[in-house]
């Protein structure tokens, strides 16, 4: 976690998680036990899923039912010396399954096109088969792409057939500052009356200087992420601004699929690539988030989310 190029948010998250879940020494036997538990959770989930599928068969609904299977996150499970899911963009955490079973199409075919959870609603609407004008009316103003047209020949769809990249955003206050997490847990354990608990929690203030917010884009070849203070929402336009206000990761997913070598450690060598990916991230952020000014954040006493570049240096 202390290797050069690792964002400080990785270690801070693991420290905060230790507060909530307990210490987890870096020992092989402990990682094996964690993975054993995780795999058994998956097996248990599969058994419940199997029960649903069997019931569809019993009700003779299988050939009249579209099934969509996905998840909200994975488990780091020891990868990169991390566990849980939090302040990172590693594939073990954010690359989740997306399986669509449609009775009108053959199964067991993989599609390599990039998708995003924003695409779920447009896809579900697309799978209804209703008139296009009605679907467009229902989806008016919504973000995301309809992946249902790819079902006919998913193996033929290119990497960017649906979208130029997949956007990932993260900003979880509870895990941004381990000391804040410890104070939060202590208060939670005191079992105060609800009103007193709310007042006590409101008096706590995490250290917003920690760069725990994440904006990431995966274009299929490269994964680019910047970690920033949640009090410093901004759209970097230059390399200097990017490096000054962010911890940066850049992975070559073709030549480094395990994401072990952060190319952003050599910013001058990869200047052009960094700025290309930064521009892609900015464009996708504008398209799918809009004005990324932090206004979605909950209120804290004295907090101000939409900081200008000049104001950022005060924090």
Feature-to-residue mapping (PLM):
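Polar, surface-exposed loop/tail segments
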Residues: 63-68, 108-217, 275, 293-301
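Short clusters of hydrophobic/aromatic residues that line enzyme substrate/ligand-binding pockets
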Residues: 77, 147, 263
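Short loop segments at secondary-structure junctions
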Residues: 102-105, 129-131, 153-155, 220-222, ...
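A structural signal for well-ordered alpha-helical segments within the folded catalytic domains
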Residues: 36-50, 93-94, 115-122, 126, ...
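Active-site-proximal cap/lid insertion segments
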Residues: 1-64, 68-114, 127-137, 244, ...
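C-terminal, low-complexity/hydrophilic appendages and adjacent surface loops
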Residues: 90-92, 169-265, 308, 314-315
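Long, internal low-complexity/basic segments
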Residues: 5-30, 243-245, 263-315
């Amino acid at each position: 976690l202390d290797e050069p190029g690792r964002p400080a948010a990785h270690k801070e998250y693991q420290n905060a998680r230790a507060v909530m879940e307990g210490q987890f020494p870096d020992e092989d036997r402990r990682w094996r036990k964690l993975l054993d538990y995780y795999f058994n959770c998956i097996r248990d989930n599969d058994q419940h899923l199997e029960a649903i599928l069997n019931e569809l068969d019993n009700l003779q609904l299988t050939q009249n039912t579209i099934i969509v299977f996905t998840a909200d996150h994975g488990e780091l499970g020891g990868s990169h010396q991390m566990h849980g899911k939090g302040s990172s963009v590693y594939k073990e955490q954010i690359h989740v399954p997306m399986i669509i079973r449609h009775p009108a199409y053959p199964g067991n075919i993989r599609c390599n096109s990039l998708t995003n959870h924003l695409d779920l609603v447009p896809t579900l609407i697309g799978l209804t088969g209703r008139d296009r004008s009605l679907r467009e009316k229902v989806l008016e103003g919504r973000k995301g792409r309809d992946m249902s047209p790819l079902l006919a020949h998913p193996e033929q769809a290119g990497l960017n057939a649906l979208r130029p990249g997949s956007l990932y955003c993260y900003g979880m206050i509870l895990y941004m500052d381990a000391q804040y997490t410890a104070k939060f847990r202590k208060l939670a354990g005191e079992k105060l009356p609800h009103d007193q608990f709310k007042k006590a929690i409101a008096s706590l203030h995490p250290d917003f200087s920690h760069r725990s917010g994440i904006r990431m884009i995966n274009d299929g070849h490269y994964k680019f992420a910047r970690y920033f203070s949640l009090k410093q929402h901004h759209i970097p336009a230059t390399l200097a601004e990017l490096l000054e206000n962010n911890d940066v990761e850049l992975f070559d997913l073709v030549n480094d699929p395990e994401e072990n070598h952060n190319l952003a450690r050599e910013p001058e060598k990869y200047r052009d690539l960094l700025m290309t990916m930064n521009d892609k991230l900015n464009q996708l952020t504008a398209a799918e988030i809009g004005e990324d000014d932090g206004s979605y954040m909950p209120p804290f006493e004295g907090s101000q989310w939409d900081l200008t570049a000049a104001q950022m240096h005060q924090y």
